[in-house]
Amino acid sequence: MRVHTGDLHGNMSRIIEFIQKNQGKENCYLFVHGDAGINYDLGEGDRKKKQELQKAVEEFWQKNQKECNILLIRGNHECRPENIYSYEKQMRWGGQVYVESEYPNLIFLKDGELFKIEGSQYLVLGGGYSSDYFSRMLNNEGWWPDEELSKIEWQKIIGRLEEKNQKDLDLLNLIVLSHVLPKSCAKVFTERKQTSRTEEKMDEILERFGSSIKAWYAGHYHINEERNMSENWKGEVKIFYDCFWKE
């Protein structure tokens, strides 16, 4: 079972309640589309939230004898896991992930990696731009200068996809998992005129590999909405906030 939800911003009650109510007839892969809020204060607050989540998934196992993994896409209001000493890199589902030994079921999917889970193929493109970064800096709120993927990181991601495409390596029916949407898709859901490198590079991904991408799932916008796009790219866009959507 693959389930998607949106930003948590440190409030774990919604996701814990979902895990507790789930009957657990099959393994659960629970995707959080950014800003989970567990790598935010980088201290005791984060630790308590991680303990709550890990406890919930362990109780899920004890009750159902089925596994529950919380798969996290990086947002723009959280520290990169690779910059936190307690995370180690592992290979899962065909791609690289970041995991802490204390919380083995809280798994950050590395940006730019391809994953195959229960027959579906995913491309992960995390991060985003904080339009409120100046006020966040002034008020000593969480802001990270590497919230967006760098130009070099984007070049590497696009290069890897080009290589796979040229070699015909099963780059079909991709579902992109992200925090924000490409510029061409975001304008349908928001009136914000300011754009970012992330949104523009995502548009480049669509232009180059749109024929391989069947759907794009995101968070960030604090709405639950879906739409079939048809203008420049024909595919399905879903935005998650406080819902739980099962694939």
Model-derived regions: residue spans:
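Conserved beta-strand segments of alpha/beta enzyme cores
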Residues: 69, 105-107, 121, 215, ...
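Conserved acidic residues
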Residues: 28-30, 173-174, 214
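Core catalytic region of metal-dependent phosphoesterases/phosphodiesterases
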Residues: 5, 10-117, 190-203, 208-209, ...
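Extreme N-terminal starter segment of soluble prokaryotic enzymes
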Residues: 1-3
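Active-site-proximal loop/helix segment associated with metal-binding centers of metalloenzymes
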Residues: 95-98, 117-196
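Catalytic metal-binding/acid-base residues of hydrolase active sites
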Residues: 8-9, 36-37, 76-80, 128-129, ...
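Binuclear metal-dependent phosphoesterase catalytic core
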Residues: 116-118, 204-211, 222-247
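Generic hydrophobic alpha-helical membrane-span motif
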Residues: 13, 41, 81, 125, ...
